[in-house]
Amino acid sequence: NTASYTLSLHDALPISGIYWKDKSGDRLREWLGVDEDTFYNSGLFAVIPMDFYFPGHGKSGDLPPRKGFAEKWHPQLLKECPDIELTLLIGQYAQAYYLHEKVSGKVTERVRHFKNYLPEYFPLVHPSPRNQIWMAKNPWFAEQVVPDLQALVQKIIH
């Protein structure tokens, strides 16, 4: 199967040199319904950051990626991933960049109405453990969104 996903996010390359090799990644793989080996070694997943440089932390989360990075680098990187079937837009910066006029409200509303963005995009909240409060306030995410995401991922990779 030559399908791949693009996970668009604003995180910088971590010290380990491997994206999603942390608790956020554990949660993301759980949401996707795949194990670590499938995620890293199947050739089915691609990660394209919103910036290669981590801009630092702000009062309510990470600072935004540098302006112009995605415009300059994403078209070149996406040429290397010609068989993308689904793009996961993780967090507000990826969603704002890719959804343009499709943006309706905040991350929570985009995630709640994820079906409006299919089949091309699937907006997600960042899977950080820091989002425990968000998860508790939005039980519909685990009850409705995660099962739909898992079913879609399984359909694509099998």
Where are these regions (language model features)?
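Pocket-edge structural micro-motifs
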Residues: L7, E30, P49, P123-V125
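Short, small-residue-biased leader/transition segments that mark boundaries at the very start
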Residues: N1-L13
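Flexible, active-site-adjacent loop/turn segments at secondary-structure boundaries
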Residues: A3, S16-I18, Q132
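Glycine/proline-rich loop-helix segments at beta-alpha junctions forming the active-site rim
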Residues: D51-H158
